[in-house]
Amino acid sequence: MNCEATLTEMRYEAPETLDAAIGLIGAETGVAKVFAGGTDVLVQMHLDLIEPDLIVDVKNIAEMREVVEQDGSWRFGAAVTGKELMDNPEFNVAWPGVMDGVRLIGSVQVRGRATVGGNLCNASPAADSVPPMIAADAIASVVGPNGRREVPMA
């Protein structure tokens, strides 16, 4: 049996601030991927669908881990897992339809790792959390090297 593998160099960074993450992504001349739960990125890498030059793990960024009620609205970061949202009783009461969609994401094990932000960003037509977010008039706050913008789900 003949087995051959080609390894390419990949950097992994785990910044602690949003500005640091944006700086890393903005400075990368190759392919950069954001890593929150990893359930999509790792599968895509395993299947050789993507070969990132840089992985930026955002789980250490406080803003990406928050679930916050503010002025009658709720905000949760891109690194919040489905399980973490399910474990937040106040969010469950405020947004039962959104939580119905979150509960449809994968298995119990997947929800413990997968993020709702990743479910949205993956842009899969089968993303379970997207229809309830559209119905709830959710707005994504997208941040990158060119600043922040608010993007309605609808």
Where are these regions (language model features)?
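C-terminal structural segment of proteins
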Residues: 1-154
